[in-house]
Amino acid sequence: MSLISALQTTDVESVQTSPEQITERKAVRVSTLQESLHSSEMHRAAPETPRSISNSVHKLKTIYSTYQQSGQPLSKEAIFRAKQKYGILNTPANYKTLGLGDSKSESVDLAARLASKRTKVSPDDCVETAIEQKARGEAFKVTFSKIPLTPPEDVPITVNLGLKGRRDFLTRLAAQKALAFSPSLDNSMKGTSDSSSVKKKRFSGAPIGNEFDANLVNPQHPAGFKSLDLSKVLDGAERRAISRVNDRLYPQKVNFKNGLQSSDQSGVSKANKEVFKKGTLEKLEHSAEQFLESHAGNERQRLSDQQYMCAKGAADAVKDLDPKTLEDPDFAAREAQKKLYIKQVASPVVLNEAQKLANRKLQDIDSRDTYMLLFGNQAYNKLAVNIALQHYSVKQEEKKKIYLGGGLWMTPEEVNAVAKKLISPVVNEIDERASRQRDVDKDIERRSRVLDQEYEDGNSMERAKEQNDGQLLLAMASKQQQEKEAKKAEEGQRYDQFVQKMNIKLQQKEKELENARENRENLRNELQERLSKNLSGENDELNDWNDACERDLKNSSIEHYYAVRSHFDNLGNSERGYDELLEERSKIQVEIERLVASIAEHKTAIHGFGETADAGGAIPAVQKQKIPTRKDLLDATVNDPLVISAEMAKEEAEMATEECMLKELQVDEMIIIRNIMLRECEKKLEEEKETAKRSRRGTEESKNNSNFSRDVIMSTPDNNEKVTPIGKSASPKDVVKSRFLSTYNTGKDIDSSASARSITGVSGVLDDGPKTPTSNKENELIDDEVKSYKVHQAVDGTGEDSIANKRDKSSRPAANSGGSITIEQFLFNKNADKQGLSKTESVTMKREPVVDQMDSKKGHDFTHCNDNGRRSFSGFSQGSIENDYSNEVTDDQDDQEGSEIRVRDSNDSNTSPKESFFKEVI
């Protein structure tokens, strides 16, 4: 009974191989009775009103599409494809290939066998048809046992054969005893031989694989049969019973991920996993497409025809062949011996003894461990079935749910939700790809329309140009001749007038030089007299100046407080601008690379058109023969060069356009590089501001010290000035006098621009060393490198000092460019009398606009950086050179200024943005 139940259970398990029934496997494993009960209950839980196929198909067509995006339930096709994609359904990837290794040889073999079957065989001939040597050898291996049967007296009793060996030995021993003591063996042998011969004659025309050919055995091998080995069956039944009991008593949790069982429990085979790896299916499809492309339909038909002809030839060759010539002469004798031995082994006595021995052994096993075995323990089985029925009756509320095993139930809505989550990435990906493809198609259509229109416009323009050129050539020739003669006469008159004018200017300049020398001597004498009169009031003015310095220090501390608040904002803005410039530069570099590649392609196309045009567009003789009429030949020979020239002109125009775009991008890249340098300088400026603010805090703390003297405040000049502190050690009168005399008594002639020398508004002293003039080229280089950095450094004095140490001493700080003060204004206080202010107040008032000028210039630089993307480089035809001569003094300006000659500073805030822009570009 236990053996039968075990076989039934294994049969039930072997049937359930479909991955769709994986979730119900544990429920079926309980037992045959429990399986029937569960199946009946599940049938009762099925819906009472089944849908017809036509209705479901109609609803799918009308309501649901293949892929849904609006949250509606998915269609059956979508669910099927999702299951197939994730390996839930059975696919051909789960099985090995069923094709033949060598199609030609197999077809020849098959043809030979069929031909031999068609041959006529005599009815008395009991010889079997030919069997291959390999098949014969395999039949012998299966028939004969590896361990020969020995009599019991030859086997020592002390040898431990083990469970399996002992069972084999006892089975063979029972068979020997049954054969030795059975009197009716001969009659049974005769009956079986007669029946076998009848069967052989009856099924002689059947195929080879439908009969068992080994009916006789060799008498030299008395133990040639394979013993009935039930050890594996029993071991497997025990393991399955124990596992089922453990599963009932201690159920394990099944891991699920997105509604599918994970790892090995999901039913996905290793072969399926290998096939569904990333890129495997694409490789298989690609190889299949290559094979189909390489073997066209006619070639594949030709291959099948060749195989058919080969098989037909082989069949014709063996059609009249006698089967006896292919078999072994001793084959009939061996077959008779084999059949005799099989009849002896298959006798009822042997089978009964073997069955009794097997039942006795199974009863011993069942009686030994009854509490662990499921089979043979009817009480245990009934109790398990009753408990299962009680649990099932309690959970009647799960009637409309799907049982997944292990106590897990799911509603159809949850299953649909899981399937929807699994298929939504596929749906989104398909929709995204479709939308991208539609956008690309629209863009291609739009571009094609634009290109066609441009091509038509270009053709019309070329036609109009050719017509106008013919009319303008004659008129332009005569007009150029007349203009040449008029220009020649006009240039002669202008040259004479220019010579006369320059002579007059030279005389005027000589007179002005004499007057300037006389004025210089008079001014020197007058200044010496006035200095002697004004030195008495210098001490009072110096005290007032010290008070003004203290006020300036307080004002600077207030400015420092507000600057600290805006420091971090400026630093963040500078870093963001720096990152934006880097990103814009990378984009421009990518566009430059694309344009270079496109220009190379255009050059290649132009070269190909040139070679075609140089070849003369000659038509080969073979192609001429294919042209039907003379008119078509004329069109081919005349229109083709025109088309080639038009295509070549089109490629040249596109290449010229892209070269212009490349030049513009290169200019924009240079501008962005300069702006990146500006951003880096701004970062350094903010860092130096922080250090300057820390040092200034120390200065404010030391302001209340009683020993703090005026020398500390007054010894902070610009970097280009050499200052002696004004204090108790030297009188102000001696200091001012010595500095004035050292400035104007240096010997030799001093040009008229000496009156424009400026003094600082902080230190209150004159410049000690004269400045060395620099060339225009050197000034431009210094402006290009330092201007953008110095403009932002003008807000902070400490940052200005650090930059001035690194740059050339010829570049003035931005504070001095705010407005120069002549010596007459400083000594005679002309502007102060007009405005009603003291000297110290005028000095402090002049320092305030510097920050405003620098801030305005900084904002202008930011707008200039933002306009770089919209500028177009078209040479110097947009008025960019007009500012190059802005520093020269014209005749009208010379007359208006008189004796005052002021040189325009490169850092002056009045310089135009165009001038600074083109200086950076060049």
Swiss-Prot record:
GO terms for biological process: eisosome assembly. GO terms for cellular component: peroxisome. Residues 889-898 have a biased composition (Acidic residues). Induction: Expression is regulated by the AZF1 transcription factor. Residues 871-880 have a biased composition (Low complexity). Residues 687-703, 844-870 have a biased composition (Basic and acidic residues). Residues 1-27, 34-53, 687-730, 751-778, 791-821, 834-922 are annotated as: Disordered. Pfam families: Eisosome1. Residues 1-21, 751-761 have a biased composition (Polar residues). Belongs to the EIS1 family. This is Uncharacterized protein YKL050C. It comes from Saccharomyces cerevisiae (strain ATCC 204508 / S288c) (Baker's yeast). The lineage of its organism: Eukaryota, Fungi, Dikarya, Ascomycota, Saccharomycotina.
